Amino acid sequence: MATSDLPDLSQLSIDPVPSNAGNFRLLVPGPPENTSEFPTVPIHIVTSASQLPPEFLDPPADKQIVIGLDCEGIDLCREGALCVMQLALANAIYLVDAIDGHEALIQACKPALESTNILKVIHDCKRDSEALYFQYGIKLNSVFDTQIAYSLIEEHEGRKQSPNDYISFVALLADPRYCGVSYLEKEEVRDRLRQDPEFWTYRPMSEIMIRAAADDVRFLLHIYQKMMLKLNNKSLWHLALRGSLYCRCFCTNDNEYADWPSLPVLSANLFIFRQTRTLTWQLFSVLCYLEDLIAEGYSPEQEILSILNVPPGKMGRVIGKRGASIQSVKECCGAEIIIGGAKGPPDKVFIIGPVKQVRKAEALLRGQMLDF
């Protein structure tokens, strides 16, 4: 599909949601027959929980729901305030206004955001998860992270990526394999944010705010459908596990995530969540495949998240000149190494990957902190 401009968003209706809104669809439709044309959907600005679909507010235990998710705020992180949370459903986009709706509105969304029965399609969930956790006590769970999925697909199809090669959302949208639309307005919004960090706090929301917020989730369900056609069973397992680790990444606490949902693990016959004892959305599709492999002695390589505390004044050594030191560790170990950067935390390094790779990275990074 050739790259095209985004649809004319002026055709979309933008209005409050009636309190009895009941048009929530439980199943995500397949990709449009003509993928060069995306159907327009209404955009609803939500300031009260009663304006959200009941099946979202109270996720049914016997059904699986797939939604698109993104968050906007002031330099969004643990301290950067969440202003808008966007939800893309099959037939509508909901802009959940955290400012006018206050904490009560976001707390009303907590069961859905933590539910294993609602799959949240999101691009790079780490900072969104951090903001939700530290500002609202929400433990984001059951995500389909399109950034992770893209890397797994590239690896499976034989296109090797460098350790720092993370696909941006704009680049993912432009990729004709998944969406094939340009997102020129994203740069305009970034320019406005650089000039005015309070951009997302203004009320009522301007047309460009509404359009930009909606565009960040509009195509996620379509991308999800495309990616599911490319992900093999082994990749789905790694996607489920790594997505859970991404959600935890910046959400550091003192109890080693004891109060978080359990990570997916391999039992004797089934993949289960230790606490819920139910199959997850991704693992259901690979169950039969992996049961056969288990019988043959196969065990998926467990991945972990390790948090390395860096002593004061040592982060420069860890990173190295122009990132050379940390880049060499990534290339040597194959683990994913993440630093907080300007948003922090400034004294920690986060390492995600198979256990052996993570332990090797830990040793090398500790060596760089030593005084000689």
Positions of predicted regions on the chain:
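N-terminal accessory regions of nucleic-acid-interacting proteins
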Residues: 1-67, 235, 248, 271-286
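Short acidic/polar alpha-helix capping motifs at helix-coil junctions
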Residues: 17-19, 94-97, 309
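Short, conserved catalytic or adaptor-binding loops enriched in Gly and charged residues
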Residues: 32-37, 87-88, 296
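Short glycine-enriched loop/turn motifs at secondary-structure junctions
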Residues: 36-39, 113-115, 302, 343-345
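Conserved DEDDh/DEDDy metal-dependent 3′-5′ exonuclease domain
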Residues: 39-230
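Short, flexible/disordered secondary-structure transition segments
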Residues: 143, 230-238, 340, 344
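Mixed-charge, glycine-rich, non-catalytic linkers/tails in nucleic-acid processing enzymes
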Residues: 190-193, 197-299
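Predominantly single-stranded RNA-binding modules in RNA-associated proteins
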Residues: 249-372
